[in-house]
Amino acid sequence: MAYLDHAATTPILDEALDVYVQTAREVGNASSLHGPGRCARKRVEESRERIAAALGARPSEVIFTGGGTESDNLAIKGIYWARRAQGFGRVLASSVEHHAVMDAVQWLADHEDAEVTWLPVDETGRVKPFEAPEDTALITVMWANNEVGTLQPIPEIVATAAGVPVHTDAVQAVGHVPVNFAASGVSAMTITGHKLGGPQGVGALLLGRDVPCTPLLHGGGQERDVRSGTLDVPSIVAFAVAVEHVVRQQQHELARLTALRDELIKRVGEVIPDAVLNGDPVERLASHAHFSFPGCEGDALLLLLDAQQISVSTGSACNAGVAQPSHVLLAMGADPVTARSSLRFTLGHTSTADDIDALVAALPGAVERARRAGVSR
């Protein structure tokens, strides 16, 4: 099998799996006062410190959650609610965000009367220059796009914010580009385990100590009174191991994946000359190659490749199965037909040249069959 969908989820690292299994054999609620509880708490706090050190944050700024979607919702709704009480009622969000961000922002507009400004992007997917109105409660712009891989100018956005809290979804960025929470200047940053070799179902929100945030979940207040719920200790420990690993290996993997990605792009262009590469040609993740294939339905092409044991995607797995054009490509100026004719190939720590060979061997026949089937309009 050629697995080319690492942006949806990447295989768990051996060292993360080993420590998960080891920790899962232990007993203890990290909120309990007895010995097993204190042992569990120690593992949680050590993991918090390790993640903080790897990502340029203070341990107290690491709030464990159930994953990227929860972290995005906590940051967007929580900061908005806290700031609305101070008279700020507007949210600025890029038009190419993951649906965990877009839908949370739209929910605030629909249910909380938030004023929303969707920030336009250029043809590569980079946010165009903007100014934040005085009533802005929050700005949210992802660090790296999950579909086309375009990197956003986060330092410039923070400078433009002029004191307005900035949230960034860095789920796709950690381990692929240098990420430093303090140096970036953002107020809140979303990360998750399963996109970097950790378990599914665990993530974190890095939240500045001076950033007000109203809780989404109420209960024990385990995480700085901002997030409640019994902590998943084995997943948290494995998550920390994975974060440390990908940050430590980032430069090596950058070089390796860049070479693989460039080879993939070159060879796809050779066998499908009219394929169109989407996203920024330079400021892009080494893991991502996103193409439009004129005359093809993306879903049909995906299934034809899947029949040959090649796993790819048409975009976010969180929106898979929904027959609609990519909102990312539409925001970049593509027409709906083109936006439905695209595939995302994403690489990760298990990717090899054999995966690219398998894709290139299967792609021409799949494209020919998909074109015979045509594109719905």
PLM feature spans:
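Pyridoxal 5′-phosphate
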Residues: 1-377
